[in-house]
């Protein structure tokens, strides 16, 4: 497969050196995010990738040994600094002195590469740490768990970072660093590749070299005892040489660290993932439908999407995705229109669209009538838009302009051309290019497939020069559109920041009653709630449930209760030992009178005792028979993933739920947009939107149920598994017919264990200020427009004092990054008061961004110019300092202009000390030790 794509921008110089290698010049000045965005400090990782000196411990002259290969790679890479071999067997190696021990080296190497037996690694790391080495690559394999821990213990006191063990090493081509035993070097480029698999590292290098693909960094994590995916994502997110990050993942261990780093990186540049190791282990041990459906791979899928990354299935797709995501800048439509001169290639594209989940547009009548004016009578009058093989160049232009007049009815346009003898393909391209240039004025996002070889080569080149994505085959183009659409959806999920506690209708759940019920169940030695208990939990969270009563295992008692409820009814077996009642004949529906109930109860007891003789029979549940016309059966559930913590499931329900396998997973917390996105990832979502004579279902009711389950998981850590199955829904609403809940006091659950930290609503407070209430709270995505108004109100001189240049306007993407923050590592407190219209008015913001290890955080503060001297800055800084101190941050720092007297005075009053900025007389550094007693005003 070949992908030929260039994206031409006026401020960029682009050279296509091969079909899959495109080199872009650095972005123009001023394209960096301007306000309150600080570069993350990745402690000592720069010593891994850009060291001043390197030692190869275990270097050898043996041609086929790891030490020999590593020495030749490092010594011959063109690295500018000194490279020291360490091996007591040699006096000279490659004509230079070889040192017997680490202590014999003339200086402390900034980076050490260790390729000696496992038993030697701990002592070597200890020696290197003592000498002052900042980073080590441990190639050695076979370390025991105890040895790995001892290695980390030896490295920790001096913050020496360790890559590995059991890894191939790393390559940083721009630094001419090849600290690996790979068989070939990597070309310089703009892609970073990070892999857990060593074998894949070498295979990928070979594959990429054949296609002239270059890399900024190429990293084998090995067993990632220290440096892991989270560290690499943090480092690469702010690396200016890296345009996209490619990951090969087999397992993830620290979910919150990974998600926090992934979300931060995905806000800056595309992050594309190949995830291997699909496992069914979780299904085998599951006691619920949700557990059986929530395999580890489904959860990882949900995590990748929620972090704004894109998952692909192969190495080939990895590079296709990297190419299209880094070059295609137009907004992608959620549907596609195909414009072609050939029916066959159009059908191929339509088939590919179905396979990739790319919906085709149904052409509107106004659009059809518009195209009727410029196309022959026998055109397809549908999608694909087939303009017939004899089309002259002007017909292509007319069709394109006709579609562009209806952008809302067209979506993304896929143009497919097959060469004909009627008109040269080059003439068609020349005629179309003026219509599609420049990109900023293009009405439609456009991707093309010029099918063929020499006959379309020049036409393809013309489109590439016009900044249009070009592919050889329709299937490739459709796959690219599918990737763009999935990526856009994931990026939309990335921008959501729901609180942990938020019901859809604003109501408050009865958390206390649920906690008491569950504590009573656990105290009794049970871990499964009865059906009535599970439904009581649902009712406490305002999830509608069917009327359900419990009776002893007696047919007469069941008949009497049924009469009180009213016929028709359903009876079910009540047993702690039976999870899926239908499997043992433990459910009978639509019983019309007392005689039916008696007969069903007797028969049910016989069936259950025969098929499950050891089960404890606690009685029956009797419930009203709910009949809803044209209703769908759904499942909503939750379980605890061992890595990512609580997860939520939605899908098609009923007894065949595991057979249908129409479900999707999401990580809590959920708000309404995230709940709707979860629903839309299933096939049953199309049925819920209505079809033929079936009206659309009440999707709001389903959304409310999903949000209620999300809040339940946050409020009650003891919930280990939950099934609401079926939840039936139609246009009248939703109601739960059955529910199961398993509880445990041993699982790490609740909001504190969410892989994505919820919006910290509990941090909001109101204080008295100038005779009025002042709200201090964390910023949230919904603040975007208020924050824009705040920034536009600032005085340019104040902005210069804080940001060192004057600028008040910004792009929406820049503004979004200020209000869509990751509360795991960043905090922004805003101060607000009501304006004359009762809306919140932002008066100031104090922001801090912490290192990944939370050792230090850099802060910034800015307030409205008319409020200088009002005490607002002190209030905001006090709030920020209390928060950072409370989460264990050690130091709070900032860089200020020397002339910024007002900020310096405030900082002094708060206990900050000033130090000079090296080589810069215009700025000073402010530092506050947070874990020391606060200075009193």
List each model region and its residues.
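A short, sequence-level motif marking secondary-structure junctions
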Residues: 2, 592-594, 742, 779-782
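Low-acidity, Ser/Thr- and Arg-rich intrinsically disordered low-complexity segments
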Residues: 3-12, 18, 31
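Catalytic-core regions of core metabolic enzymes
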Residues: 36-739, 747
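Leucine-biased recognition of intrinsically disordered, low-complexity hydrophobic segments
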Residues: 5, 24-27, 33, 37
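Long, contiguous binding/interaction regions
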Residues: 749-937
């Amino acid at each position: 497969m070949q992908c030929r794509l260039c994206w031409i921008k006026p401020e960029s110089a682009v050279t296509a050196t091969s079909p899959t290698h495109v080199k872009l010049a650095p972005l123009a000045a001023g394209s960096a995010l301007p306000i309150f965005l600080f570069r993350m400090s990745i402690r000592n990782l720069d010593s891994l990738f850009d060291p001043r000196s390197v030692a190869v411990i275990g270097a050898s002259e043996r041609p086929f040994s790891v030490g020999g290969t590593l020495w030749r790679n490092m010594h011959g890479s063109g690295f500018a600094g000194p490279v020291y071999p360490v091996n007591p067997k040699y006096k000279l190696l490659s004509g230079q002195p070889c040192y017997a021990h680490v202590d014999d080296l003339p200086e402390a190497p900034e980076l050490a590469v260790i390729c000696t037996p496992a038993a030697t690694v701990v002592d070597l790391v200890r020696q290197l740490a003592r000498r002052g080495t900042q980073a080590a690559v441990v190639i050695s394999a076979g370390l025991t768990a105890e040895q790995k821990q001892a290695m980390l213990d030896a490295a920790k006191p001096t913050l020496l970072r360790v890559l590995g063990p059991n890894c191939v090493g790393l390559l940083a081509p721009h630094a001419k660093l090849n600290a690996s035993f790979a068989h070939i070097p990597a070309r310089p480029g703009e892609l970073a590749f990070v892999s857990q698999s060593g074998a894949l590292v070498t295979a990928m290098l070979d594959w990429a070299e054949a296609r002239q693909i270059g890399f900024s960094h190429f990293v084998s994590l090995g067993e990632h005892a220290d440096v892991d995916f989270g560290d690499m994502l943090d480092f690469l997110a702010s690396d200016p040489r890296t345009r996209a990050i490619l990951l090969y993942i087999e397992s993830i261990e620290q979910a919150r660290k990974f998600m926090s780093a992934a979300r931060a990186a995905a806000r800056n540049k595309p992050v594309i993932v190949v995830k291997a190791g699909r496992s069914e282990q979780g299904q085998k041990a599951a006691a619920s439908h949700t557990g059986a459906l929530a395999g580890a791979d489904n959860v990882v899928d949900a995590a990748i999407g929620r972090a704004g990354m894109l998952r692909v299935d192969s190495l080939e797709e990895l590079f296709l995705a990297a190419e299209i995501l880094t070059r295609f800048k137009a907004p992608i439509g959620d549907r596609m229109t195909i414009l072609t001169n050939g029916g066959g290639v159009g059908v191929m594209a339509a088939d590919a669209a179905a396979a990739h989940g790319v919906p085709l547009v149904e052409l509107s009548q106004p659009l059809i009538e518009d195209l009727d004016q410029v196309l022959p009578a026998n055109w397809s009058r549908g999608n694909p838009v087939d303009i017939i093989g004899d089309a002259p160049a002007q017909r292509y232009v007319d069709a394109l302009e006709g579609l562009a007049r209806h952008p809302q009815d067209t979506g993304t346009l896929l143009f497919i051309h097959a060469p004909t003898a009627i008109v040269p393909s080059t003439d068609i391209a020349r005629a179309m290019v003026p219509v599609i240039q420049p990109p900023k004025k293009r009405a439609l996002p456009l991707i093309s497939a010029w099918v063929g070889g020499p006959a379309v080569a020049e036409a393809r080149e013309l489109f590439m020069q016009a900044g249009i994505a070009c592919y050889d085959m329709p299937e490739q183009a459709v796959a690219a559109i599918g990737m763009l659409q999935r990526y856009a959806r994931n990026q939309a999920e990335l921008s959501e920041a729901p609180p942990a506690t938020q019901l859809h209708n604003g109501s408050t759940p009865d958390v206390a009653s649920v906690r008491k019920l569950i504590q009573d169940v656990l105290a009794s030695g049970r871990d499964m709630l009865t059906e009535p208990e599970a439904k009581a939990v649902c009712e406490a969270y305002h999830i509608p449930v069917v009327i359900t009563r419990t009776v002893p295992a007696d047919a007469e008692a069941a008949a009497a209760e049924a009469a009180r409820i009213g016929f028709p009814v359903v009876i079910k077996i009540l047993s702690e030992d039976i999870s899926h009642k239908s499997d043992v004949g433990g459910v009978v529906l639509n019983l019309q009178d007392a005689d039916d109930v008696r007969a069903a109860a007797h028969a049910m007891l016989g069936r259950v005792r025969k098929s499950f003789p050891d089960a404890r029979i606690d009685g029956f549940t009797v419930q009203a028979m709910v009949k809803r016309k044209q209703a769908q059966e759904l499942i909503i559930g939750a379980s605890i993933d061992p890595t990512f913590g609580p997860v939520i499931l939605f899908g098609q329900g009923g007894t065949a739920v595991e057979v249908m396998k129409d479900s999707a997973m999401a990580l809590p917390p959920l708000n309404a947009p995230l709940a709707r996105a979860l629903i839309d990832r299933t096939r049953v979502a199309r049925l819920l939107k209505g079809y033929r004579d079936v009206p659309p279902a009440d999707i709001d009711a389903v959304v409310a149920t999903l949000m209620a389950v999300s809040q339940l998981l946050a409020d009650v850590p003891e919930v280990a598994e939950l099934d609401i199955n079926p939840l039936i829904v139609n246009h009248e609403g939703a109601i739960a017919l059955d529910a199961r809940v398993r509880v445990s006091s041993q699982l790490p659950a609740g909001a504190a264990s969410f892989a994505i930290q919820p919006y910290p609503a509990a941090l909001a407070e109101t204080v008295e200020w100038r005779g009025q209430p002042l709200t201090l709270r964390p910023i949230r995505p919904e603040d975007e427009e208020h924050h824009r108004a705040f920034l536009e109100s600032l005085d340019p001189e104040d902005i210069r004092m804080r940001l060192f240049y004057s600028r008040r306007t910004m792009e929406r993407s820049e503004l979004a990054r200020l209000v869509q923050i990751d509360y795991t590592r960043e905090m922004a407190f805003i101060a607000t008061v009501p304006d004359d219209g009762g809306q919140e008015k932002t008066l100031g913001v104090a922001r801090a961004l912490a290192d990944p290890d939370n050792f230090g955080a850099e802060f910034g503060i800015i307030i409205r110019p008319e409020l200088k001297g009002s005490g607002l800055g002190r209030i905001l800084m006090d709030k920020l300092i209390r928060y950072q101190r409370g989460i264990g941050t050690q130091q709070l720092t900032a860089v200020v202009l020397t002339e910024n007297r007002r900020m310096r005075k405030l900082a002094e009053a708060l206990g900050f000390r000033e130090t000079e900025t090296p080589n810069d007389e215009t700025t000073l550094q402010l530092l506050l030790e947070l874990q020391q007693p606060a200075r009193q005003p």
